[in-house]
Every structure is written in C-alpha cells, then in structure tokens.
Amino acid sequence: MVDRRNLLKAGLVAGILPLGSLASAARAAEPLQIHRAVYDSRFATGRAFAAEAQARGWTTAAIEGDVTQLWYHQLNLRWREGPAPIAGVTQENSLFVLERLAWDAGMRVTTRAALPHEPLVSWLIAPPARRIRA
C-alpha cells in the first residue's frame, strides 16, 4: 500500500535521479536515456519509485534482492551492444553486483544516495563523464 510517507520518499528518490541525469547529460551534451529502472519490489518505496519511473515512460524491472535473472535475461544482452544507463532503488548489495557488472560495459555508478530510514539506496549507473582537456 502506498501511503503518504512512501509517496514522499518516492518523491525524494525521483528528485535525486534527475539531478544526476541532468549533470551527466550536460557533460555528455546529449540527453541521458534510461534503459531500465530497477526496483526492489519487496519495499513500498521501491514500488513507488517504479510507479514514478513508469509515469516518465521508463521500462521497469522488478527484483527481490537477487539481480541474476535481470542480468542474465536483460542487462547482459543489452550491454553487449554498448552502454545503456540504468537507474534504481535497491538494497546496497544489489547495487554492488550491478556496479561490478556495469564496469565491463564501460559504465560506473554516477549517482548514489542512501534513503533515510530505509535499507535502500537510489542510484544511477551510466557512462562516466568525458574528461575535458584544457
């Protein structure tokens, strides 16, 4: 059930991700397209994030802590073609695994924020900003 508390937390999460997206997009000089919005469906905050992501037109992917199926059936296939940014609200251990897998696709965690009073973090995995030489 989505109550006022979880709705406010989802707003906080939704507010965090665009800042990272805008900063990355400004550095890359092109809009950042989110390939997947990953959320842990065991948590109301994760489900609220998924609803917000769907409202933005993002494709969502639910997990229950384990990212194996997501990796094997979706991300691995797409990341073989090249980088595809993903955003999410998961537990830290799920992010840890996704972060390591993203390295092989040339991506890094570019935004990470712990959610207050939750065992969750919001994050963005995307290609790192291009370095500008002076």
Regions found by a protein language model. Give the residues of each.
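Extracytoplasmic/lumenal soluble domains of exported proteins with redox or metal-associated functions
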Residues: 26-134
